[in-house]
Design a protein with these regions (language model features):
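Short, intrinsically disordered, charge-balanced linker/junction segments flanking boundaries
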Residues: 1, 208-211
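Chromodomain-type histone methyl-lysine reader module
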Residues: 1-199
Length: 211
């Protein structure tokens, strides 16, 4: 309702359309048929989580004028994970990823070593698309999910808002990096990795969704 009253509603709708398309392109979930949806909705043991669209104004910085300028509207569709019940919907622990001091000390030591070439990467959509653990989650898309309003999905991959999203994403990233030849994980667990490729030593430091 608030979007309909907003003077920039067309730009906001376009941002929502792009977010829905990203879910489709990444195959986050599959739509239920009318028969499947009726069966799920009538089953008292199944909880259908709601999703909502979160909007944010993105800005860019002009180094010449040293001012920020509006760039675009950004939409993000998130599952309302607060409706997940511990012990029923979640049978394992959840956590918020943080940085460890041991990782910081090791990273600073590597940065001071001239033999390393330093680069940083932001993993776009890091928490979106990770393979889920062995459980079934149903999500009802919001009214402003352009073209998919009210559709019920069975998630195939983790989505923003799920309490297990960070756990799933980090586990998948660690599994990928550890698949490299001669890779070792340091005492900091899934935050620090070291491997050799083409006789070159590589060190990877992870902080939330940045490398």
């Amino acid at each position: 309702k608030e979007v309909e009253k907003h003077p920039e509603k067309d730009e906001i709708r376009e941002a929502a359309r792009k977010e829905v398309q990203q879910w489709i392109d990444m195959q986050i979930g599959v739509s239920l048929s009318p028969e499947e949806r009726a069966k799920v909705e009538n089953d008292p043991s199944i909880v259908i989580l709601n999703a909502k669209m979160v909007y944010k104004r993105k800005y860019t910085f002009d180094p010449e004028t040293k001012q920020e300028y509006f760039l675009k509207w950004k939409a993000r569709m998130a599952v309302v994970g607060t409706s997940e019940v511990a012990g029923l919907d979640l049978v394992w622990s959840t956590f918020s990823p943080t940085v460890g001091f041991a990782a910081i000390r090791l990273m600073m030591a590597c940065l001071c070593n001239p033999k390393y070439t330093v680069g940083s990467y932001d993993m776009t959509g890091f928490f979106l698309g990770a393979e889920m653990h062995d459980r079934t989650v149903y999500v009802r898309l919001p009214r402003d999910a352009v073209g998919q309003e009210g559709v019920v999905l069975r998630l195939l991959r983790a989505a923003y808002g799920l309490r297990s999203a960070s756990r799933d994403a980090i586990a998948q990233l660690a599994k990928l990096i550890l698949s490299f030849e001669e890779t070792i994980a340091h005492e900091d667990g899934d935050r620090v990795f070291k491997f050799h490729k083409l006789a070159v030593e590589h060190c990877i430091f992870r902080y939330v969704d940045s490398l």
